[in-house]
């Protein structure tokens, strides 16, 4: 059985990964239309219909949520609509229903964090849900937090014409990414007309009518709206977890390498089980938990082998260790290849980007790969397979990449790490 209090498919499908990709695709098409004259196409200045843009995004989410419902019926899984509460480690109640099970998996996800001095109101101060369903296009938009979510919204709203100010308290935007890639992303966003402030805090936000006044490093600034994207907290409350002894640390459920909590037979997966808060990590954790329950021998999750993607323009994708992290473990070799030297990138008029690879100098093991540019969110899986199979630098160098493709930049980056670059 499955207990769910909202839409099937969770945050990712309904209010996260999927609907935002619809919005960002709209922005990508608009950006290409604006640059069409460079390709010999004469197109009047494109305009957007905000209601239609939002409606398509919601329709996509609804279609896929319906698909999950179909899968539940097809596999004869009983749905209990409502909040599940533990009565003991083998029993939960959902409304008037009592469900007894030998094993229970908690997959309650996470919710956006507020800041003590900034509270989302849905009108002028938005969380991700409000930012996905705007009723107006702000002329001036403040985005607080420049992780993947903040950066994606910055790309969307900037492309559709808002003047975006992106503020991050850390020293770099995209704090989870390699600093060189993050710096390239920041420079690109600035070149696109955004204001990007790092190592900067937002001290106060006040709303007066249709105007929002923010105090940024002591200076008062006016905006039409703000998006708060400063991380998430696990949905651990009101489940009865404490009563049965499940250990919770810093707002997330503690689990072992097989997703087992501190209580035998109770598992946790996904965002509620801690970072990184990524849907593909959640799915894999679900498989690990179920394989363990049915007596198979699952491989534990290796968090250094989880790819991460940011669907901004330019896109960012990575897997493994950053250059700094890898360097702390020993001697490394680093390869770099700019997309400016890639034939396919030149042909499709999208040459902004870099592929960076990091190897263990003694073993040739691929420790990390970091990419920025067109299509990199689709290409990163090649490096994910390589790391998963523990491929060496020589095996990667001997691999034939098709021409002309953007993926050739991956090959050239590997060659670069060993001084064998061909096209740069």
Segments predicted by a language model, with ranges:
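Flexible, glycine-rich terminal cap/loop adjacent to redox cofactors
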Residues: 3-6, 18, 22-32, 294-295, ...
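Glycine-rich Rossmann-fold phosphate-binding loop(s) that bind the pyrophosphate
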Residues: 5-6, 144-147, 271, 275
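N-terminal Rossmann-like dinucleotide/flavin-binding domain of flavoprotein oxidoreductases
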Residues: 14-15, 19-98, 177-203, 208, ...
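Glycine-rich dinucleotide-binding loop and its adjacent helix/turn
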Residues: 17, 108-167, 195-196, 242-244, ...
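A short alpha-helix-loop-beta-strand transition element characteristic
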Residues: 30-48, 111-113, 247-249, 296-305, ...
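Rossmann-like dinucleotide-binding cores of NAD(P)H-dependent redox enzymes
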Residues: 54, 59-69, 133, 138-142, ...
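A Rossmann-like FAD-binding core segment of flavoenzymes
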Residues: 78-81, 85-93, 99, 161-257, ...
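FAD-site-proximal beta/loop scaffold in flavoenzymes
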Residues: 118-137, 220-300
């Amino acid at each position: 059985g499955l207990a769910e209090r909202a839409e099937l498919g969770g945050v990712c499908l309904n209010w996260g990964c999927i609907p935002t990709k619809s919005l960002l695709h709209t922005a990508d098409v608009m950006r290409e239309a604006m640059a069409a004259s460079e390709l010999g196409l004469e197109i009047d200045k494109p305009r957007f219909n905000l209601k239609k843009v939002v409606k398509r995004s919601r329709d996509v989410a609804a279609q896929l949520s319906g698909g999950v419902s179909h899968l539940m019926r097809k596999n004869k899984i009983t749905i209990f609509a409502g909040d599940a509460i533990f009565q003991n480690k083998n029993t939960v109640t959902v409304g008037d229903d009592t469900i007894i099970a030998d094993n229970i998996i908690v997959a309650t996800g996470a919710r956006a964090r507020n800041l003590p001095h900034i509270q989302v109101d849905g009108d002028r101060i938005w969380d991700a849900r409000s930012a996905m369903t705007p009723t107006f296009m702000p002329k001036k938009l403040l985005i607080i937090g420049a992780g993947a979510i903040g950066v994606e919204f910055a790309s969307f709203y900037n492309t559709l014409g808002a003047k975006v100010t992106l503020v991050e308290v850390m020293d770099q935007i995209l704090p989870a990414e390699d600093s060189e890639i993050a710096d390239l992303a920041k420079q690109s966003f600035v070149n696109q007309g955004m204001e990007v402030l790092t190592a900067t805090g937002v001290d106060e936000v006040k709303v007066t009518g249709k105007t929002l006044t923010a105090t940024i490093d002591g200076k008062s600034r006016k905006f039409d709206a703000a998006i708060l994207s400063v991380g998430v907290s696990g949905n651990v409350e009101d489940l009865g977890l404490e009563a049965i002894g499940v250990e919770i640390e810093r707002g997330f459920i503690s689990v072992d390498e097989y997703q087992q909590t501190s209580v035998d037979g109770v598992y946790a997966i996904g965002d509620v089980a801690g970072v990184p808060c990524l849907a593909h990590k959640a799915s894999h954790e679900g498989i690990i938990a179920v394989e363990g329950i049915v007596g198979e021998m699952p491989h534990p999750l290796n968090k250094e082998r989880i790819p991460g993607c940011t669907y901004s323009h330019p896109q960012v994708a990575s897997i493994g260790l950053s250059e700094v992290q890898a360097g702390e473990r020993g001697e490394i070799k680093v390869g770099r290849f700019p997309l400016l030297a890639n034939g396919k990138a030149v042909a499709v008029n999208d040459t902004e980007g870099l592929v960076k690879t990091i190897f263990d100098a003694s073993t040739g093991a691929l420790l990390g790969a970091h990419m920025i540019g067109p299509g990199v969110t689709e290409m990163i899986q090649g490096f994910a397979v390589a790391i998963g199979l523990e491929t060496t630098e020589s095996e990667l160098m001997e691999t034939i990449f098709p021409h002309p493709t953007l993926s050739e930049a991956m090959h050239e980056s590997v060659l670069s790490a060993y001084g064998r670059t061909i096209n740069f």
